[in-house]
Amino acid sequence: MKVLFINPPIYDFSAFDLWLKPLGFLKIIDLFKKNGFEIFYFDFMDRNHKFYNNIKVKKGKFGCGKYFFKEVEKPEIYRNIPRKYKRFGLPVEVFIEFLKDIKNPDFIFITTGMTYWVLGIKEVVEIIKKFYSRVPVIIGGIYASFCYDDAKNLEVDYIFRGKDIFKFSYDFSSRFGIDIKIPDILKPYWGVYEKLDYLVVKTSYGCPFSCWYCGIKQFEPEYKKRDFDEVVEEIIENAEKFKIEDIAFYDDALLFNFDEQLYKILEKVKRYNKNLRFHTPNGIHPKFIKKEVAYILKEANFKTIRLSLETIEKNRIEESGYKVNFSEFENSIKYLIYAGFTKEEIGVYILAGLPGQMPNEVINTINILRNYPVKIKIAEYSPIPGTVDFKIAQKLYPDLPISNPLFQNNS
């Protein structure tokens, strides 16, 4: 049987490939491959597609870079925003040429990213239905999980919510009458790409913390470490296969239980490959950066450190379960600098646009951070359905259409 997997284009005001890959989707592909299905894959966001050979798009550092884009008409809800709205990713024509070679797939899977990227999902569904009107279409991912009611308006046959692979296997088997067995080891199947500039990895699932703005608990309710030997094998195998130097960690709590997890992974990896560079695009917890941890990260060749400070406002920190207090943050910076990290390598995330947040809170945080050798990274708040902050926003701003996925765009 044949299965077609699709990662849609992005419709947004801006988009940049900052180690962006559909990691969970690649695990679903691995599941079907190990169950004997023939796999076809199209990633609109693949910057290594041959289409890019004929255009000039600037590449960034460490495998990151810009996407091909085309300006498009803004949806009505954005009409007063004085910015250009764009469609990022491979052109529709490239996708259609690809589909012409895929005869009668048995199932079609579409992953969904940020809730406000919904227009890319709609585009793909509409095209797919023209080509394969009777083929079952299944969607999953972030938008499908957090905006389930909105997703029901799409012309799809099944919407999977969350990341429970056992539930997915049961639901799929029950609905379509095909037994899907869960293998002992399930990991992202990178073989769908001919070339990669970087690898993204998770050493754990879920998060032991419960920040008010974060939706991870709805996706992965329990924190669980992966087998570190399995992670090491995944890194070494794919780094060698694709000649990769850059590895980005997707963990929500990368340094949690450092000695028992990440430290062991780094120690084993360097025995096989000492030329890798590591990056932490997700904010890490400053309180876990002790002196020895900072030196280990430096020795392991971490090039991108992103710390989550979020705010210096004490009441918000105490109420909302955020990742750090300021003294822990100061210590983490001290240890990182002592270990040899530079200002260019240390970025600090602060949140802006939280429900009820006044501009002075953000300004004060920025002014204080200017006294430290770090790059300030403002993370604009995006309301995630089901989170505590989303419910607060609904109460504070009852007249705003917060439940509309397009309105959840932080731009």
What residues fall within each predicted segment?
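Acidic, low-complexity intrinsically disordered segments
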Residues: 2-244
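Hydrophobic/aromatic residues located in beta-strands of well-ordered beta-sheets
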Residues: 3, 39, 108, 137, ...
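Glycine-enriched alpha-helix->loop->beta-strand junction motifs that scaffold or abut catalytic
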Residues: 155-156, 298-304, 372-375
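Catalytic cores of alpha/beta
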Residues: 148-154, 292-293, 355-370
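Short phosphate-binding/catalytic loops that engage adenosine nucleotides
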Residues: 37, 133, 302, 341, ...
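Short, solvent-exposed turn/loop segments enriched in Gly/Ser/Thr/Pro and often Arg
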Residues: 143, 252-255, 283, 353, ...
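C-terminal accessory regions of radical SAM enzymes
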Residues: 4-11, 15, 20, 42-52, ...
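Radical SAM [4Fe-4S] cluster-binding motif and immediate context
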Residues: 185-343, 347, 352, 367
